Amino acid sequence: MSFEELGVSKWLSEALNSMKIHTPTTIQSACIPKILKGHDCIGGAKTGSGKTIAFAAPMLTQWSEDPSGIYGLVLTPTRELALQIAEQFAALGSSMNIKVSVIVGGEDIVKQALELQRRPHFVVATPGRLADHILNSGEDTVCGLRRVKYLILDEADRLLSNSFGGDLERCFNILPSTDKRQTLLFTATVTDAVRALKDRPVPKGKLPVFIHEVETVDKVAIPSTLSVKYVFVPSYVKEAYLHSILNLPQYSDSLSIIFTNRTATAELLRRTLRKLEFRVASLHSEMPQTERTNSLHRFKAGAAKILIATDVASRGLDIPTVELVVNYDIPADADDFIHRVGRTARAGRKGDAISIVAEKDVDRILAIEERINKKMDLIEDISDNKVIKDSLNKTSVAKREAFMDMDRENFGEKRKINKSKRQANEGTISIHESKKKKHHK
């Protein structure tokens, strides 16, 4: 079946064809017709299965028939995912002179306010920065949001977690009520919190919520083309084993993403690997937004072969040529593992995911294996003797030098300052809101 047969506009089908996207995926075939008919939608599918086009295609089709005001708002948990979605919208709608605004932290808030006042066709935002505008930028800036036709929550499971609660509520409060807009939720992991939304009462005149999930027999949510492996190591020599993995012939020229649990670890690894002459970039919350964007561009262009990242990069990022994901640290949540390894083996390609497992990680690995319904294979290409001979000494020296550099530059001080600023800002917001409540009383 073609996109046009699903109800997608001719101009948009041609745009998809020009991007070499000819045949709809399962989630696109299931969701696009339902969204075009007016259903709210919950879409769950494996990473790399085309979720963005599943919500973009019907929305752009209907927007092109009535392109006035802010037509749709897309909320995402990370800045990088917001930028990527905006790029896809801009590419798909280029022939229609589409205007897309990205509203994320780390960018000039005054410039963003002016963009919102000009009423772009679509806004792609992180909840925190949009909530900031709603509170502080004035009615002229945010009044266009009061008439949006669509609200999309991408990576909905993460957005509906407690960490986004207050900001998300502020964003929802300015939008039209649920009976006057369509709400679309997309995620690779359909959690109970997401699924519960289906059971809410349907407003009068609204169609029932359509839900598309990964089939029960295929509940794994990781691609069948993904090879999942592990290496068991002493925790104090993880860098040496990582060095050995990256030097294996099959990965020496691959695009690889290495995930860590902490920003300090990501920064230490970046500096260590750079001293070992790897072409590396990093992506974590301590970096200014311009540096984060530049790192991604370098990695996508192949100027950096390795991206070292915290979970800020585990959601939604679509870099099809990534062949290897390394879990340098094992995530506490099995769903985070699924999102991390989903950065490779995308759209039918093959990929490898290797987890570096220390003594303390065994319980986490067992929980992950149960969640993905698959046993990891022990990687056979690496021996302890080879690591000691080829990697141990040089990685120890590089790590020590990297650590001294970070200490000298006071890495981490910025985090403390930003935390203090954030707490002060939250205090200001609480005072602001309590004053508003008193005023309304």
Curated annotation (Swiss-Prot):
Signal peptide stretch: none
Keyword NAD: no
Stored InterPro entries: DEAD/DEAH_box_helicase_dom (IPR011545), DEAD_box_RNA_helicase (IPR050079), Helicase_ATP-bd (IPR014001), Helicase_C-like (IPR001650), P-loop_NTPase (IPR027417), RNA-helicase_DEAD-box_CS (IPR000629), RNA_helicase_DEAD_Q_motif (IPR014014)
A GO BP annotation: endonucleolytic cleavage in ITS1 to separate SSU-rRNA from 5.8S rRNA and LSU-rRNA from tricistronic rRNA transcript (SSU-rRNA, 5.8S rRNA, LSU-rRNA)
Gene Ontology, cellular component aspect: cytosol; nucleolus; small-subunit processome
Family, per entry: Belongs to the DEAD box helicase family. DDX49/DBP8 subfamily.
Protein's recorded name: ATP-dependent RNA helicase DBP8
